[in-house]
Amino acid sequence: MGVRWDGQRVDAIDRDALPGLEGRSGLLRTFDTPEFRDMQFLEVTSRTALNKVPGNGFMGGAWTINPYRGCQHACVYCFARGTHTYLELDSGRDFDTRVVVKTNVAQALDAELSRMRERPERVMLGTNTDPYQRAEGR
């Protein structure tokens, strides 16, 4: 089972992407690890690290960073499961076993902050999935 960026170079144009996102596929590599049987890590580059939460509600106006999409913890009640469908992955087993890793999130954050006139007062880490995946401990 593939994802929409399979076989693309980092600089490739994804013609099936939403308007304005065509050049953001950025797949570096995918790999399986013996320590985490049945897990697949999809390494991608990201042009941005910060996300501005729209609205006025609970988190409205806040800034977040999510270094991953998907989560090894596999909590069945996780509200973020549905976001995997945006990647043409399923929100069930794929969310638990196919984790997208943004490998350059620190560099993207540095570049983004250097361009901002007014820096965020606070940034919340890992609001969509756990910011520390078990594989990082290896």
Residue ranges and their predicted role:
Residues 1-34:
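Polybasic, low-complexity association/targeting segments
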Residues 32-68, 76-138:
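Conserved Radical SAM active-site core
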